[in-house]
Amino acid sequence: MAKYTRLRYDVTEVPLADLVREVMGEEDLEGLAASDRVATRETDQSTPYHRRFYDNVDVISPVYRTLVHRLLGDEVDAVYIQRIPTFRVHLRNSVAVGSWHRDRDFGHDPSEVNYWVPLTRAYGNNTLWIDEEPVHAEYGEVIVFDGANSWHGNVVNDTETSRVSMDFRTLPRSSYEPNDRKSISYGLPFRLGEYWDTV
């Protein structure tokens, strides 16, 4: 059985989905058009939806940081957070992440903790899988898991809805070691002020 913790937050106080709908210019995130091809590791971050999200990260960042404060509470001063959250779109007939992986296989520190934040319903084959188990979640829930060391990924979405989510990682400040390895999603070095930040 996959190991994870389920947290909840108030979506009226941290309206992430509303903000993402606004910056993407999309009324219905679950209704995003089906894909005509299955994404790969090289293409899973290159849809027009991703461009709109990352082009507006300065608008999203304050609400993202509010979420981090709500989730971490007093622990926020003991960790570094991923400066720019990773955006995921699991379109129908495609995948959100091009390959099953453990984050450590891509240069991430083994002591990192992953926070997966669905902005739509996540169920059936449109959801995140951890250690070969689908993790169902609703908007307003956050799944916390050991993505550095646990196999995770997804399968082709054969549901009737697209899934939109974001995720981020934390790193204990005591484990931080500056290095020049780069994140696979957007090529940022795993350094403070680049990939990592304080809240």
From Swiss-Prot:
Keyword annotations: Antibiotic biosynthesis, Streptomycin biosynthesis
Disulphide bonds in the chain: none
Record keyword Transferase present: no
UniProt KW Methyltransferase keyword: no
SUPFAM superfamilies linked to this entry: Clavaminate synthase-like (SSF51197)
Associated pathway: Antibiotic biosynthesis; streptomycin biosynthesis
GO annotation terms (biological process): streptomycin biosynthetic process
Purpose of the protein: May be involved in the formation of N-methyl-L-glucosamine.
Protein name (database record): Streptomycin biosynthesis protein StrG
Species for this entry: Streptomyces griseus
